[in-house]
């Protein structure tokens, strides 16, 4: 894949980067809602900026890349973040992975994903846990949350950023799937978390890691 990027001319440019455009690019679904929300913002959507500010101080978006792929050990399949954002704070650079949601689940639990695991899967899970300072991972945690969060740390290393973060940008009126996210945050030692709140945890790399659940403007569900 080329490393040359070109500016977006609008939300519809995002469609072509989806793994299954005809399936996922639909009104009321996260991919389309997320694209319209971020394109409408002057920089960062306010609900996302608030979480970033709560973690590391006032943020300024440098650039955002839809459907950004991050290589992981233990196989050839990358972690594909809905958005990768490089952000400047007064205290330094931060890399963020953004996971868009409406009603969609976070996918398999670690227990399901690792059942009859190949050597590659065992290697990958061990790597993900080590990056987050976990001796082992609770089987009920969603695997997607693990690799999406570690992707932010990998990109922070690549860009020599001081901080990293993973934010779920949800447009669900009922905050569907929040309980999966809250369980993940607690596993990492972040305690109890509420929507709209930032939690910052320490990581073995020495980079502080922010986690948050941003409640998106539901008008974008109609976009």
Predicted regions and their residues:
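Acidic-basic catalytic patches of nuclease active cores, encompassing PD-(D/E)XK
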Residues: 1-76, 89-90
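Short glycine/proline-enriched turns and hinge-like loops at secondary-structure junctions
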Residues: 76-77, 160
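Conserved beta-strand->loop/alpha-helix structural units within folded catalytic cores of enzymes
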Residues: 80-84
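Active-site beta-strand-loop-beta-strand hairpin of nuclease catalytic cores
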Residues: 85-97
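Short coil/turn motifs at secondary-structure junctions
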Residues: 88, 103-105, 173
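Short loop/turn segments at strand-loop or loop-helix junctions that form parts
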Residues: 98-103, 169-171
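Acidic, metal/cofactor-coordinating or nucleic-acid-engaging core segments within structured domains
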Residues: 104-166
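Non-catalytic C-terminal interaction segments of nucleic acid-processing enzymes
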Residues: 144-223
């Amino acid at each position: 894949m080329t490393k040359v990027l070109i500016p977006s001319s609008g939300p519809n440019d995002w469609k072509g980067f989806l793994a299954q455009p005809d399936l996922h690019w639909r009104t009321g679904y996260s991919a389309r809602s997320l694209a319209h929300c971020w394109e409408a913002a002057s920089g960062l959507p306010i609900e996302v900026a608030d979480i970033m500010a709560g973690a590391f101080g006032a943020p300024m978006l440098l650039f955002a890349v839809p459907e950004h792929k991050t290589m992981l050990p233990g196989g050839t399949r990358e972690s594909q973040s809905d958005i990768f954002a490089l952000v400047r704070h007064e205290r330094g650079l931060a890399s963020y992975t953004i996971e868009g949601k409406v009603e969609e689940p976070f996918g398999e639990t670690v227990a399901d994903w690792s059942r009859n695991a190949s050597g590659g899967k065992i290697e990958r899970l061990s790597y993900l846990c080590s990056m987050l300072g976990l001796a082992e991972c609770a089987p009920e945690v969603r695997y997607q949350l693990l690799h999406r969060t570690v992707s932010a740390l990998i990109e922070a290393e690549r860009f020599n950023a001081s901080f990293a973060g993973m934010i779920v940008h949800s447009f669900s009126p009922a905050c569907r799937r929040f309980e999966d996210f809250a369980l993940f945050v607690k596993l990492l030692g972040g305690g109890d978390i509420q929507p709209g709140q930032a939690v910052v945890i320490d990581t073995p790399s020495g980079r502080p890691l922010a986690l948050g659940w941003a409640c998106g403007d539901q008008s974008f569900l109609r976009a």
